[in-house]
Amino acid sequence: MADTTGRIPLWLIGTVTGIIVIGLLGVFFYGSYSGLGSSL
């Protein structure tokens, strides 16, 4: 993994992308669940 042919390592891109996706999904599900709980 020390072979960084590009400017940004692939593992770094994957980690950042995963964190962003998980964060967006968490916010989306939390908002939908809290919205459903308040409406019901």
From Swiss-Prot:
- Any one Pfam family here would be PsbJ
For this UniProt record, give its keywords in alphabetical order, as a comma-separated list: Chloroplast, Membrane, Photosynthesis, Photosystem II, Plastid, Reaction center, Thylakoid, Transmembrane, Transmembrane helix
Tell me where the transmembrane regions lie: 8-28
Describe its membrane topology: Single-pass membrane protein
**Gene Ontology cellular-component annotations:** chloroplast thylakoid membrane; photosystem II reaction center
The highest taxon in the source lineage is: Eukaryota
Compartmental location: Plastid, Chloroplast thylakoid membrane
Identify the Gene3D superfamilies for this entry: 6.10.250.2070
Q: Which SUPFAM superfamilies match?
A: Photosystem II reaction center protein J, PsbJ
Q: Which InterPro entries match?
A: PSII_PsbJ, PSII_PsbJ_sf
Q: Which GO terms describe its biological process?
A: photosynthesis
Q: Which family does it belong to?
A: Belongs to the PsbJ family.
Summarizing the function annotation, the protein's role is: One of the components of the core complex of photosystem II (PSII). PSII is a light-driven water:plastoquinone oxidoreductase that uses light energy to abstract electrons from H(2)O, generating O(2) and a proton gradient subsequently used for ATP formation. It consists of a core antenna complex that captures photons, and an electron transfer chain that converts photonic excitation into a charge separation.
The record, for PANTHER family, names: PHOTOSYSTEM II REACTION CENTER PROTEIN J
Complexes and interactors = PSII is composed of 1 copy each of membrane proteins PsbA, PsbB, PsbC, PsbD, PsbE, PsbF, PsbH, PsbI, PsbJ, PsbK, PsbL, PsbM, PsbT, PsbX, PsbY, PsbZ, Psb30/Ycf12, at least 3 peripheral proteins of the oxygen-evolving complex and a large number of cofactors. It forms dimeric complexes.
Report what the protein is called.
Answer: Photosystem II reaction center protein J
Originating species = Pinus thunbergii
Gene name per UniProt: psbJ
